[in-house]
From Swiss-Prot:
UniProt function note: Chemokine released during platelet aggregation that plays a role in different biological processes including hematopoiesis, cell proliferation, differentiation, and activation. Acts via different functional receptors including CCR1, CXCR3A or CXCR3B. Upon interaction with CXCR3A receptor, induces activated T-lymphocytes migration mediated via downstream Ras/extracellular signal-regulated kinase (ERK) signaling. Neutralizes the anticoagulant effect of heparin by binding more strongly to heparin than to the chondroitin-4-sulfate chains of the carrier molecule.
One term under GO cellular component: collagen-containing extracellular matrix
Gene3D superfamilies the record matches: 2.40.50.40
Protein name: Platelet factor 4
The protein's assembly and partners: Homotetramer. Interacts with TNFAIP6 (via Link domain). Interacts with CCR1. Interacts with CXCR3. Interacts with THBD; this interaction enhances generation of activated protein C.
Source species: Mus musculus
Gene: Pf4
């Protein structure tokens, strides 16, 4: 018996093929669904924070990452004029100054 003859005997029924086609969109939807965050990492970005030593005039931009499944606390990341990114400590006066400036503008 040839290999082709064996495979001819294993053809699925039309009902089975139709069932497979019906489940295909569900399988694709489940496998393409990712975590909420686009970076794919479900952990806090700010492992270490800075509480002092940075003046507001050295900050060029801010990024706020709200609390969620990835991290229990909101994170505030400041980009400095030299390109360095730092995480600000939520309990520090600097954090409160930055938030106040954001709310005033």
């Amino acid at each position: 018996m040839s290999v082709a003859a064996v495979f001819r005997g294993l053809r699925p029924s039309p009902e089975l093929l139709l069932l497979g086609l019906l489940f295909l969109p569900a399988v694709v939807a489940v496998t393409s669904a990712g975590p909420e965050e686009s970076d794919g990492d479900l952990s806090c970005v700010c492992v270490k924070t800075i509480s002092s030593g940075i003046h507001l005039k050295h900050i060029t931009s801010l990024e706020v990452i709200k609390a969620g499944r990835h991290c229990a606390v909101p994170q505030l990341i400041a980009t400095l004029k030299n390109g360095r990114k730092i995480c600000l400590d939520r309990q520090a006066p600097l954090y409160k100054k930055v938030i106040k400036k954001i709310l005033e503008s």
